[in-house]
Amino acid sequence: MKSSLFSRYTCFVLSILLTLVFLIMMRNHPWFWLPALACGGLMVLGIYDLTQQRHAICRNYPIIGRLRFFFEFIRPELRQYFLEQDNEEIPFSRTQRTLVYRRAKNEMGDKPFGTLLDVYQTGYECIGHSMRPVEAADPTSFRITIGGADCRQPYSASIFNISAMSFGALSANAIRALNLGAAKGNFYHDTGEGSISRYHRENNGDLVWELGSGYFGCRTTDGHFDPRRFAEQAQSPQVKMIEIKLSQGAKPGHGGILPAKKVDAEIAATRGVPEGVDCISPASHSAFTTPLEMMHFIQQLRELSGGKPVGFKLCIGHPWEFVAIVKAMLHTRILPDFIVVDGKEGGTGAAPLELSNYMGMPLREGLLFVHNTLVGCGLRDQIKVGASGKIISAFDIASVLVLGADWVNSARGFMFAVGCIQSQSCHTNHCPTGVATQDPLRQKALVVPNKAERVYHFHQNTVKALADMLAAAGVSRPEQLTSHHMLRRITPTEIKVYADIYYYLEPGALLQPEIKSEFYARMWRMATPTSFDQAISLPAA
């Protein structure tokens, strides 16, 4: 017992003894005041540890117990730089980050001595190559025209674009660099729900304005949608499309609040909210409450914007809710110009752990469900579909194209391009590279012209890599890639093509008297265009 007690207080006792020793020795050698001061400081810290009530470990282990907090503080850096395996995705592996960094710097991305991947591991994926490869197409031709029959200003989008990230979440310099890179590379920059800031406008890069439930940039004083203010911004030539945000993969079904102390004059002006007051983003929209009302809201936005493409972004949660939206399309004949499917693996900032880990459908399942539902209702050829969620490489792009996407967006990929090192401190305002902070000194470290070049090169080199992959597979255009080109290892001894793994509906299948798929038949019965709620109650299994 005495031995245990002494070991717990060893550092504290030694600090007292050494303080006394150095004080005595100061009588002969005055310079001993330095170690006396240091040991005295430790002694005072030990006394504080013994008397404080917040940390039990410090009360039991004064002074030395604080090493736990120090090691806990530096653990992420130690893990990332010394312990993490090259292919360990938490959330992005070193191999993935290095790929982005090299492409952003326009450096050679070739790697010698073969793959580091275990090609016999279950889940390994690849694209089948052709014995008759074709010449690689011009990557700049990989563009998609977005805009349906009711759209008067269709937009030609790149196959690879910057996903939604708001000013406020990202620094002013990060926004500048992203938009300047997008302008040079002729691809679009999604504003995120934080509205269009002056930094988005400086370099005139194409913008997709994301409209969240807070209606930032076009809201009334009580937080509702303001048609007049919306029209003023949406009709700007720089704004190419309007995207209604229903949910996002990082925290689906969750609203948000920006504390009053963070709502400075610049954020307030950008979002159209009072300065110094809590900025609330509700979990759901007030402009519509049913799928039918949502379709009419889409039509209203299209008219107010001057006929620009209008669509929505969502992470699939309850499947019947999306089916209800599609039924509302059929009922009203009002169609969105596009739909962006966000996977639950997405997320550029902080989110409640339970929501980021356990809410929402992963991208591939959500994307295929959206694609199948539109195909089954005969609407797929009238609505373009985008995808976002942990997409950074040409292979990532190809793997979602075969599941129904027409184009893709990337957020964290472009964050890496402007300097993000995955410190995972986005929510602390202490981002070490100036990407995700509003600290004026920290964001000064991000040099806009330099990082804009990296954004441009990352996009350019990634799309070029996609063109090379397609050519090796024997196709020249992204839309020619099918589920028969992509393979996945199912067991250590079996590989299947996507066409044999995933279920694809036939055109018009959901409009037939009898729906062959039991799952889609059940979702169809559960959905109604008049409500997001279930139309029927199913018996318990």
What are these regions, as identified by a protein language model?
Residues S236-R271, Q422-L441, H459, L466:
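Mobile "lid/hinge" segments at catalytic clefts and subdomain interfaces of large enzymes
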Residues I280-Q443:
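Glycine-rich phosphate/ribose-binding loops and adjacent secondary-structure elements
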Residues A172, R176, G185, H189, ...:
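Internal alpha/beta core interface subdomains
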Residues R219-L246, P362, L367, N372, ...:
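Phosphate/diphosphate-binding loops
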